[in-house]
Amino acid sequence: MKKFILTLFTTLLVCLGTLTVAQADDYLRIGMEAAYAPFNWTQDDDSNGAVKIEGTNQYANGYDVQIAKKIAQEMGKEPLVVKTSWNGLIPALTSGKIDMIIAGMSPTAERKKEIAFSD
């Protein structure tokens, strides 16, 4: 009986883990500070095409956000901004917390060692 319950519990965890991954695939998580107007900023509503900031009741907007929306649309995903400090952007990308950085980051030689940049 204990083996059956353990097997059932393990199967349930695997299924729930798969469900979480499937839900995450619906979103393109974009890392940015949301504090560098006019490129990206934080606002309290979704006016003028703003995008929800993950884990908050706020929204992000600006040039970077509008570009992110176009990229997400082309990929068939919903854009979701993950507000991240400047120094946390690369670690967030390399750890998989975000899918891309859209924040006016220059492609320095040091940064190119860790992440890829678009042309």
Q: Model-found features: residue ranges?
A:
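Ligand-binding "clamshell"
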Residues: K97-I98, A109-D119
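Positively charged n-region of N-terminal signal peptides that target proteins for export
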Residues: M1-F4
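Short amphipathic alpha-helical "recognition" segments used for binding
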Residues: L6-T7, A37
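Short, flexible, glycine/charge-rich loop motifs used to bind or transfer phosphoryl groups or to couple energy/partner
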Residues: T20, P91, F117-S118
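Bacterial N-terminal signal peptides
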Residues: T7-T18
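Sec/Tat signal peptide C-region and signal peptidase I cleavage site
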Residues: T18-A24
